[in-house]
UniProtKB/Swiss-Prot annotation:
InterPro entries: HAT (IPR003107), Rna14-like (IPR045243), Suf (IPR008847), TPR-like_helical_dom_sf (IPR011990). This is mRNA 3'-end-processing protein RNA14. It comes from Cryptococcus neoformans var. neoformans serotype D (strain JEC21 / ATCC MYA-565) (Filobasidiella neoformans). Signal peptide: none annotated. Pfam families: Suf. One of its GO terms (biological process) is mRNA 3'-end processing. The gene is RNA14. Residues 44-54 have a biased composition (Polar residues). Keywords: Cytoplasm, mRNA processing, Nucleus, Repeat.
Length: 1064
């Protein structure tokens, strides 16, 4: 090729730019026209063709760019360019094309586009070779005609070429993994043949006039995506669905990324993929499809929604109406066949609206034309449909309209002779008599219609028939009022609710149980036992349909059938309940027990393993949620924490940036503490779930031992050990099972030791192991276990272990061993009072006579008054020494109460003998109180503290002086209050606390009336708590003492010099 003038090169560049613009406009026009003209269901299929056409244009554009000749600097360079421009290929393979990754921009991130990598500018020969060679292929694979037809491609002949003076730098090889098969197909070989090897102006015109390359709808070879690490400029971008839609959760069957409900609801789809089991999101997508009349989308979303909510009536009714509106009768019949089961099974649709839609469809498909040849057959078909529907839902009080339609349909029948008229009247009478005995919403209208019907036939016989059914009608009308009172408060949500264990849930469950018990009580006095069972069965099905996710109600229904001896019906209920509540322990265990009684052992194995497989992912998901909560609680990392750690390691107080590491370390510690608090709080939830899984394993082992022997139980234990969510209860249960089954302690000890390797720091497990060793009188191993464990378990966590071993030593050890143990315990727990440990040594099985007889805890607990002796009260701090006696002020005198409804017992002291004595608490006996700021409000006497529970008593004319500070407490106490009460009548600890409060003179804030404050507190409405009842006049015994590990704890240790828990 001769030396080209720079002006020619510029002209070529301008021509190439024009070609690029034309190709881009053409590709965009093709895509826009296709997206507007094609229906939605064909969009996914034709998108491949359009993408392939676009990629072909981009490939041609890329080749044109890369073939721009460089301005030769010398004659040798020009000769090299001529040699490179030859059509022959070199024998050696083409050099690899440099491919690098381009970082997507912000706009690219929003649309999730795939980045097609631009190549650098190799020679034209290398470009064509790279296009044909699939090994160096990028996003646009191009095959030759021979390769596409299955024949081998012709190899290029080897001809030496002169190398140019400036060779492009060799780039590293690029990894080319397999791409999805949805990538656009490769163009035909004609596209490759049309690509020129030189870029003279004559060839440019041929390229523009060349026909469009052939587009294949299916890829000929797997397309290869190229993964690169560098970041060149972005040149070409191929559109794919947004990244937010892509997830591991697949779309429902029948939907694609281009379905209307998916492509036009990006936010809903992303939310659904984040939580696929959320019924609210599924219902929103289903409603959108129904509103937009997208029947394919509506079917797909309903199938997903019906997996957990097959008894939801309103979505099913909406789908039926949509199918009927589009005249899709085959789909409507399939829906009715799957939902309207005539066997009265638990999955039968129990909503009247579904049965009304069914009858509407039957009458629409069987139009009745009087006088036609098939009129009798059509009328018979409609009659059978009404009987079928009323047999299933005729007990519902909402089915009154169906009864009325049935009556009108029968009454409209032809009667050509007297016999037909009599038969029709008899049939109408039977239908009326069935309807007026049911508590329907329109029962009064039906009774009036029945009255008119009988009267129109014969007034003499009308009285007879009406008198026969009048008692049943009156009973049904009364029952309707009762049923409305029971069922009207029950909410009727669109989807069956999930239990939240709130008070509202308990009320709803209680309301349903009240309705079911009302049905079981036979309020309609139905004498036909089968009819009564049918009515109760319908009530149970309706309850379970609307409360599908409440295991308690499933168990209630199964128990009802079990009481009747109908084990098959009970098994059907429990099986449906397990399907509805797959994580229910109640239903799984109940169904497994029933199947075990019926010797259906394979079903039992499946139930236990299925429940475990359902619970394991829940633990993993909870752990991930807890980890995220911990990260959120910690917050962002502390800046400079790494440098502070390095400085602290070498002993510096200032890091490399000159910051004080103490402040940084404090912030780091606070950050870790926030995370630790969340981990501690949420860790209990994880442990609770893991314990639940272990309980299932234990129940599984029990079943295996009962059904198949101890070897089967060992096999289940072996499977349980492989569980990642195992707790120590499984080891304990297996060990005790081995011991009590085979009476072999060695096997049990080996199992305990096996669990000790994993739970050696769990004090509860160590105590269980220790108790087992002591129960089999293996004190040597027990002592060794105790010594090993107290080394591993440190601090207060080991306190239960010390107490368990101390009880054994106190009971069966010698005195020297007891003293040694107490010496060790005093070192580990120095805050314990010696009296406590001494009393524990001399107690038996929780009976502590030292506390009862010598320390008086029995009297304190039982509330027995002390004998009338000079009981000395404990001397409290002299808080009243500097307080002068209050000045007596006149107070209004209350009129005496003349009578009482019920006098208080004489042997029990009154809680408030007088307002004077009642006001002798240390807090109230203070110096002069400041006068009220609002004396005009004191227009009534101050009410007593217990004005609601005790009658008013006469108040003295003045307040007596308070008792002297200090020595006043040594005066003889009143026998009415006993040794546990202050002279004011309050408990001594409360009186002491009130004495420590500051004096009223130190208060300088606003003064409120006590009545207003009490009214404010009395009007509070706390959630989950009501107002406590008024205190009784007579004092009863206190609640029983709390029982801890082996002994009672009447009081805290601080009474006797200690600070720990327990009596002492």
């Amino acid at each position: 090729m001769s030396h080209e003038h720079p002006a020619e090169i510029v002209h070529q560049l301008q021509s190439i730019d024009s070609i690029q613009q034309d190709l881009a406009d053409t590709a965009a026009a093709v895509v826009d026209a296709a997206s507007q003209s094609l229906p939605p269901q064909h969009a996914a299929q034709d998108q491949k063709s359009h993408s392939t056409l676009l990629d072909n244009a981009e490939a041609m554009e890329s080749i044109l760019e890369s073939a721009i000749p460089a301005a030769p600097g010398s004659s040798s360079t020009a000769a090299a360019s001529d040699a490179i421009g030859d059509n022959n290929f070199t024998a050696s393979g083409p050099p690899p094309i440099s491919n690098t990754v381009v970082a997507p921009s912000a706009a690219d991130d929003e649309t999730g586009d795939v980045i097609v990598v631009e190549s650098e500018t190799p020679t034209t020969t290398n470009v064509v070779e790279a296009v044909v060679n699939p090994e160096n292929d990028g996003d646009v694979p191009i095959e030759s005609t021979e390769q596409s037809s299955g024949q081998p491609a012709e190899q290029p002949t080897e001809q030496p070429t002169e190398q140019p003076t400036e060779q492009p730098a060799e780039q590293p090889a690029v990894e080319t993994p397999q791409a999805p098969q949805s990538t656009p197909a490769a163009p035909a070989a004609s596209a490759v043949e049309s690509i020129p090897t030189t870029l003279e102006e004559t060839h440019l015109e041929q390229i523009v006039q060349a026909p469009a390359p052939t587009v294949h709808t299916e890829p000929l070879t797997p397309v290869v995506d190229i993964k690169m690490e560098e970041k060149p400029m972005i040149e070409h971008v191929a559109w794919i669905p947004p990244q937010g839609i892509h997830s591991d959760v697949f779309l429902p069957e029948g939907l694609t990324e281009y379905s209307p409900s998916v492509s036009q609801n990006g936010e809903l789809i992303r939310s659904w993929r984040a939580d696929p089991s959320n019924p609210t999101l599924l219902l929103s997508l289903f409603n959108w499809a129904v509103q937009k009349t997208e029947v394919e989308d509506a079917r797909a979303w309903y199938r997903v929604l019906a997996v957990d909510n097959p008894t939801a009536a309103q979505p099913l009714l909406a789908l039926i109406n949509l199918e009927l509106a589009l005249s899709n009768f085959a789909e409507v019949e399939a829906i009715f066949a799957s939902t309207l089961k005539g066997s009265a099974g638990i999955t039968t649709a129990a909503d009247v609206s579904i049965w009304a839609a069914y009858l509407h469809y039957i009458r629409r498909q069987n139009p009745l034309t009087e006088g036609s040849a098939n009129a009798a057959d059509v009328r018979s078909t409609i009659t059978e449909a009404y009987e079928f529907a009323l047999r299933e839902c005729g007990f519902d009080r909402e089915s009154g309209d169906i009864w009325d339609e049935y009556i009108k349909f029968v009454a409209s029948g032809p009667a050509t002779n007297q016999w037909d008229t009599q038969a029709k009247n008899d049939n109408l009478r039977k239908i009326y008599q069935r309807a007026v005995c049911i508590p329907l919403n329109n029962i009064e209208a039906l009774w009036k219609s029945y009255d008119n019907f009988e009267s129109s036939l014969n007034k003499l016989t009308a009285k007879k028939y009406l008198a026969e059914k009048s008692p049943a009608y009156m009973t049904a009308r009364t029952a309707l009022r009762e049923l409305r009172a029971l069922s009207d408060p029950i909410p009727k949500p669109i989807l069956p609710p999930y239990p939240t264990f709130t008070e509202q849930d308990r009320q709803v469950v209680g309301a349903w149980k009240a309705c079911l018990r009302w049905e079981e009580g036979n309020p309609l006095v139905i004498e036909n036992h089968e009819l009564l069972q049918s009515r109760i069965g319908y009530a149970l099905r309706k309850c379970l349909g609307e409360m599908r996710h409440f295991p308690e109600l499933w168990h209630y229904a199964a128990s009802y059938y079990s009481k009747l001896g109908k084990q098959d019906e009970a098994a059907e209920i429990l099986e449906a309940g397990v399907n509805a509540c797959p994580k229910s322990f109640l239903l799984t265990f109940a169904y497994a027990e029933l199947q075990e009684e019926r010797k259906a052992f394979p079903t039992c194995h499946s139930l236990y393993t299925t429940l475990i497989s359902k619970l394991n992912p829940e633990v993993d998901e909870l752990r991930q949620n807890v980890a995220r909560e911990i990260d959120i609680a910690r917050g962002p990392p502390i800046p400079g924490s790494e440098k502070a750690a390095v400085a602290a390691a070498v002993g510096d107080s200032i890091d490399a940036d000159g910051n004080d590491i103490s402040d940084i370390q404090r912030l780091v510690e606070e950050r870790e503490q926030r995370g630790a608090l969340v981990a501690q709080r949420r860790g209990k939830d994880i442990e609770e779930l893991m314990v639940g899984i272990s309980v299932v394993w234990i129940m599984y082992m029990r079943f295996a031992r009962r059904a198949e022997g101890i070897k089967a139980a060992r096999g289940v234990f072996g499977k349980a050990r492989k569980s990642p969510h195992l707790t120590w209860q499984v080891f304990e249960a297996s060990a005790l099972m081995e011991y009590h089954t085979n009476k072999d302690a060695a096997v049990a000890i080996r199992i305990f030791e096996l669990g000790l390797k994993q739970f050696s720091e769990d004090v509860d497990y160590v105590i269980k192991y220790l108790q087992f060793l002591l129960s089999i009188n293996d004190d040597n191993n027990a002592r060794a276990l105790f010594e090993r464990s107290v080394v591993r378990i440190m601090g207060d966590k080991a306190r239960p272990l010390w107490d368990a071993w101390a009880r054994y030593e106190y009971t069966y050890g010698d005195l020297s061993a007891v003293h040694k143990l107490e010496a060790r315990m005093s070192e580990v727990f120095p805050e314990d009072a010696p009296l406590k440990r001494f009393a524990q040594r001399w107690s038996y099985n929780g009976i502590d006579q030292i506390a009862i007889r010598d320390l008086g805890f029995n009297r304190a607990r039982m509330g027995v008054a002390a004998p009338p002796a000079f009981a000395i009260a404990p001397v409290l701090p002299p808080v009243h020494a500097s307080i002068p006696a209050p000045i007596a002020v006149p107070t209004p005198v209350q009129p005496p109460q003349e009578s009482y409804k019920r006098p208080a017992p004489e042997d029990i002291p009154p809680r408030r003998p007088s307002s004077a004595e009642f006001s002798r608490s240390p807090k109230r006996h203070r110096a002069q109180s400041p006068p009220r700021r609002y004396p005009e409000r004191d227009d009534r006497p101050p009410p007593g503290r217990y004005r609601d529970s005790l009658p008013p008593v006469k108040a003295p004319s003045s307040i007596p002086p308070p008792p002297l500070a200090g020595p006043a407490y040594a005066t003889p106490s009143s026998g009415a209050y006993g040794g546990d009460k202050d002279r004011s009548g309050l408990e001594k600890p409360l009186a002491w606390f009130m004495a420590q409060l500051p004096n009223a003179r130190s208060f300088d804030g606003p003064v409120f009336r006590p009545d207003d404050i009490m009214k404010l507190f009395g009007g509070l409405s706390l959630p989950g708590a009501g107002m406590p009842p008024a205190p009784p006049i007579s004092r009863g015994p206190p609640p029983p003492p709390m029982q801890s590990r082996g002994y009672y704890e009447p009081e805290r240790d601080r009474r006797y010099g200690g600070h720990g828990s327990g009596r002492y």
